[in-house]
Structure formats: structure tokens, C-alpha cells
Amino acid sequence: MTDILNTAAYGGEGWSPRTQSLREEIGRVWGKCGVDTEWSPLKAVLLHRPGPELEGLTDPRAFQMLAPLDAGRARKQHDALAQAYRDAGVTVHYVKPSKTPPPNLIFVADLMFMTPEGAIIARPASTVRAGEERWVARRLADLGVPILHSVRGKGTFEGADALWIDPQTALVATGLRTNAEGAAQVASLLREMGVEVIQVGLPYGVMHLMGTLRFADRDLAIAWPRRVPYAAVEALRARRYTVLFIPDEEEAIYGMALNFVTLGPRRILMAAGNPITQAFYEEAGITCQVVEMDEIHKAAGGIGCATGILEREINNQ
């Protein structure tokens, strides 16, 4: 018995204790991933290329879309979006469902929220999207991304309702798509990581926090007045952000001009066809790359909605 207790299996000679944190293991034991800001250089994204699930949708309202889509044109625009990421040096991964998924799987950002230690899996608020999170969870596991939590119980949470202000602070919103129980689960996990969580409420008629507030740099944010939560703007200003407000509401509504993805400090990828807003961004020192997205917009989402952020350069502030 003594000889057995001295073996490595029982903690004896040769035992190798695991002393690194999960965060330290990412990129070695686990796949490369992690996010703690909305503006640092973008490294990897998760997309879903629209497939046969978009064919023949005669009643878009039944799928919470705005108008019928030309599926072929939507695919071409999505392919151009993916290529724009590759051209910017971003690694593009695809969800790759094994069977035809629900039509809204294209909006991957809603299905996950990335932290420095791995992903939180969402629980979409509508029955139309129920189960989409399974495909994203499976793909994240394939990529070696740690899954820290899946929203459970009667909680609902969509990834577009959480944003990083800085590595120490995150916003989590409640509203149409995220309820109090779901927000509390996300906030609890983030607080375990030492992150300060500022919970805000969204007004009626707003889909997600992402649609009201975007970050262009460590000290520059763009917001939609009368939609963005007051507490969110106050939190940003308290942390020395300049908060600019969109110049043209028509472009924000119909062109999804605020629904951009930040490629790096003051570099964004935005939808084409928004000349007033693009000029406004450029005047603020933001470099804008544009892609056509008007067909995908008919599904009630834009570039930000379609992009699951897997990895940004991690900041050690």
C-alpha cells in the first residue's frame, strides 16, 4: 500500500500539479480566445454563412425579420463581410451546423459573450431562436474555447446586451432580449472575475444594447441619443471617454450605421450607404472600411449582430 501511495497517481513522485489559472492556459491548453475591450485589435471572429434556411421565407414576421430576403444576395454580402475580415488580418471561423438551422443563426453575436477566460453561452429570448445557442456552443468547444456558463433556468440573455467598457468594467443591459435573471447570471460570473458590472435598462423599442452604443477606441464611444441608457453614458464619461452622438437617425435606422465592428483603435468595419455617418466618423479620426449589407439588414441585423467576437488583443491595464 505504501508503494502505491508514493506513485504519481496518488500524489507521490512524478505528480504534476496544475498551478496556472484558466486565463494563463488559454492559447496552450485551450484554444486562442478572449476579449476584455470592445476596441483593441480584432484577432478572430465566428460567423454563420447563411444557407438553405433563408430560402422561401414567405412571412418574414414569423421569423422576426423586416422583409423577405434574396438568399443568394445575402450570401454574397456575407461572403464579402468575411473577406473584409480576412483582409484586415482577422481569422474567420464558421459555425458549420450539421443540419439546416433556424434562419436567425446568421446573427452569431446574440448567442455568446466572450470574456478573457472564455465564453458565456446565451439563451435567446424568443422561441423563434430557441436552440440556436447549441450550434454555437458545439463550435466553440471544437475550437477549444472554454465555456464558462450557459444561461439557465428562466433566464434569457443575448450577447449583444453586454459590452466591455474597459478590462475592469462591463455593461449588462436588461430589456426585450435579456431579463433580470439572465443578466444576474452574467453579472455574477463577471464579478467572480473581478469585473465591475454596471447594469442598465433599455427603453421600449430597443432590441439590444449593441444597437445604442459602440466603441471606436479606448477613449471614444458613439451613442444613439434617446436610446442609449443614461447610466451607460455617465459610466463612460466617468472613465474619461468622449461620447459622440450619431448625426443622422435615418441612417442609423435604415442603414444600421451604428452597427459596426471595431477592427482596432479608430478602425471600424461599417455598412455601406451611410455617407453622413461615415463622414462624421472620419471627422472624428476613425478609419472606415465599408461593405454592402442592405440585404442582410432585411433580417433585422447588421455587421455587429452577424459577428461573434472570439478574440481581441488582451489588455493588461
Language model features with spans:
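The feature marks the mature, well-folded catalytic cores of soluble enzymes
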Residues: M1-Q317
